[in-house]
A protein has these predicted regions:
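Nucleotide-activated sugar donor-binding and catalytic core shared by glycosyltransferases
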Residues: 1-142
Length: 142
C-alpha cells in the first residue's frame, strides 16, 4: 500500500466552502487505489472542528484504509512523512519539512502563500487535484 499523510486546515471562514473543500479532497482520495490514508486533525477553530467531524466520519466508514489522529507527535509524524508517497493538504509542515525527506507535497490553496518553495511542492487549488495527482505520478516529477 502507498501511504499518504494528510493535514488540511480550513481555507475560509465560510462553512459551506469548508465542507465543499474537504469533501472534494476526500472524493479525490477515494480514487486512489491501494492507498493508506493517515489524517491529522485540523486546527481547533470553528471550521477546523467541522473538518474534523467530516474526517472522523470518513475514517469510520473507511477504517480499512483511513485513520485520523489528534496529534502524532513530532517523531511519528516525521517518520510517516519520510515513508509517505506524498504529503497532502495545506499545512506549513508540507512546505517546511517534506523537502528534507524529498517527499512530494501537494499543497492546496493559498494558506502557505509567501513561503519559499522547493521542487517537491506541487501547488494547486482544491478543484485542480486531478492535475496535481497527475503531476505527482509523472516521470518528470519522480
Amino acid at each position: 500500500k502507498e501511504l499518504y499523510l494528510i493535514t488540511y486546515h480550513p481555507l475560509t471562514l465560510n462553512v459551506k466552502n469548508t465542507q465543499k473543500e474537504i469533501k472534494t479532497l476526500l472524493k479525490k482520495l477515494d480514487t486512489l487505489k491501494n492507498a493508506s490514508l493517515i489524517f491529522t486533525k485540523a486546527n481547533a477553530d470553528e471550521n477546523g472542528l467541522l473538518i474534523n467531524e467530516i474526517l472522523q466520519d470518513y475514517c469510520q466508514k473507511n477504517s480499512h484504509k483511513a485513520k485520523l489522529f489528534d496529534n502524532l507527535g513530532s517523531q511519528k509524524y516525521l517518520s510517516l512523512m519520510k515513508i509517505a508517497k506524498a504529503m497532502i493538504g495545506n499545512s506549513s509542515s508540507g512546505i517546511s519539512e517534506s523537502p528534507f525527506f524529498k517527499t512530494p507535497c501537494i499543497n492546496i490553496g493559498d494558506r502557505q502563500k509567501g513561503r519559499l518553495r522547493t521542487q517537491n511542492i506541487i501547488d494547486c487549488e482544491i478543484n485542480d487535484l486531478d492535475q496535481a495527482f497527475e503531476k505527482l505520478e509523472s516521470k518528470e516529477f519522480k
